[in-house]
Amino acid sequence: MNTILLSFDTEEFDVPREHGVDFSLEEGMKVSREGTNRILDVLKANGVKATFFCTGNFAEHAPEVMQRIMDEGHEVACHGVDHWQPKETDFARSKEIVERVTGRQVYGYRQPRMFPVSDSEIARVGYTYNSSLNPAFIPGRYMHLTAPRTWFMKGEVMQIPASVSPCIRFPLFWLSLHNLPEGLYHWLVNRTLRNDGYFVTYFHPWEFYDLKEHPEFKMPFIIKNHSGRQMMQRLDRLIKMLKDNGNTFTTFSEFVEKVKK
């Protein structure tokens, strides 16, 4: 039986700022609150668990959504403090914020935009796993063709990369589900599962917001393509396919505990 690790980088929406649009935290939070609730609706309808990597900003400005995430059985992990301006001190501060808001211990970290992190600092602060690696070659973003494809240890911290296909290392993250034909994406996921025994992917709340209805965001086509309710449907069909094939959905912390036994 193979394992599915769904994850969501639960951050304030800031993509328009990358394209020169002045965008406030309040506006970004509105988009991300709605998107996160839509994600939770899909997960609840399918009865599956996931891991939500939350920024400190999101946790402090959407405590009611954080509560829903926990009430519905999902794991909360850390994703920095301010998604737009990550800092070296975020490892400790984001953990403090998220644990204060949730009242629960946090075990995992993912750096905004999957940028590199200090493994010694991750360990020092008390995280047991780090999921900040996309082992693919995407010019201008990720240059990790020689990095391990599957989980590995660095000291006491388990590294859990996002899944890429065997051999050619095609990334199986959010943009791929937006833009590939669904049948091809599902085929690549199943091939990866047969090879690795588990599958890790990640999405963002703002993908589930109706981006096409907001030209003022100046979003590139590959990002707004199949966004909003179309993305809800794509996620729903992906989950149903994976369940029908007998896979088990688990949180990252549960996966770490299982692997370490």
PLM regions and their residue ranges:
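Generic structural signal for well-ordered alpha-helices
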Residues: 36-40, 63-67, 91-95, 119, ...
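C-terminal domain-boundary segment and adjacent tail
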Residues: 44-47, 182-261
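Short catalytic/ligand-binding loop motif for oxyanion handling, primarily in non-cytosolic enzymes
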Residues: 14-16, 60-62, 85, 116-120, ...
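Active-site-adjacent pocket scaffolds in enzyme catalytic domains
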Residues: 16, 99-100, 104-202
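Conserved, mostly hydrophobic/aromatic
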Residues: 9, 43, 79, 109, ...
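Metal-dependent polysaccharide deacetylase catalytic core of the NodB/CE4 family, i.e.
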Residues: 46-118, 127-128, 132-133, 158, ...
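The substrate-binding groove and active-site-proximal loops of carbohydrate-active enzymes
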Residues: 24-30, 54-55, 80-85, 106-107, ...
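Active-site beta->alpha N-cap acidic-glycine motif
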Residues: 1-72
